[in-house]
Amino acid sequence: MTREPHSHDPSPPKRPLPRSFKELTPANHFNPRTFFYEMVWKAWLTPRNGQHQRPAFPKLKPGDVAITWIGHASFLIQFTDLNVLVDPNFANWLFLLKRLKRSGLKLRDLPPIDLVLLTHAHFDHFHKPTLRKLPAPKIGVMPWGVGDLARGLGFARIIELQKWESFSHADWKVTLTPCKHWGARTLRDAHRGYGGFVLEHQGRKIYHAGDSAYFEGFKEIGRQLAPEIALLPIGAY
């Protein structure tokens, strides 16, 4: 395994943890008790539903792209010569949080994965048990300060990027874009980065927003990178 951190600014500025979700959303009526009831208690009482589907992946021509929403923020992006996973998480439980919809396909039905994009270190997006089980050696691309969490998870290469920094390999390119969120996995690691990605390959540009609230940066991403497809798992939490 080789770990390739960002090549400039070895100490990116830290963003303090938000004091509440009010700092991440225009809503001014956030209530922690309501959030706990809706996201935890109500979920416990709700039967899990949805069905796994055995995928019939299409035959693609150069320039074609197939995108499968697995669930939550997880997507499978396929080209003729490249299989990409974004924020893969196949778990039915995440601590107290219950998954209400089964993942759209089973982990064992995935094709060999060439590239994994991880938008930030939160447990529902950077799910270590899932990452350990992914088929085939792979490249992992993630924001600054997250690479240490990826050690020992089977990645052949680990790439960390700063905002607006790009990494190219073969004939594909990925750029880390800003988002309105935060990156800490615990209360003591606010140095970790966060963002979204624009993936460019075979003339296509695909944008995954990460775990972002709405912000003016969407306009800047559109101006600078002009993605043609946007994957917006906003509100998935």
What is the predicted role of each segment?
Residues 104-111, 167-171, 188, 219-224:
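Short amphipathic alpha-helix with an adjacent loop that forms part of the alpha/beta core around
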Residues 77, 87, 120, 127, ...:
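Divalent metal-coordination and catalytic microenvironments
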Residues 24-27, 96-142, 157, 224-231, ...:
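Active-site metal-binding motif and surrounding structural segment of the metallo-beta-lactamase
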Residues 54-55, 72, 101-106, 126-129, ...:
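A generic local structural motif
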Residues 129, 181-237:
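Active-site-proximal loop/helix segments of hydrolase catalytic cores
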Residues 93, 122-126, 147-149, 165-168, ...:
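Active-site environment of divalent metal-dependent phosphoester hydrolases
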Residues 1-94, 98-109, 142-208, 228-235:
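Metallo-beta-lactamase
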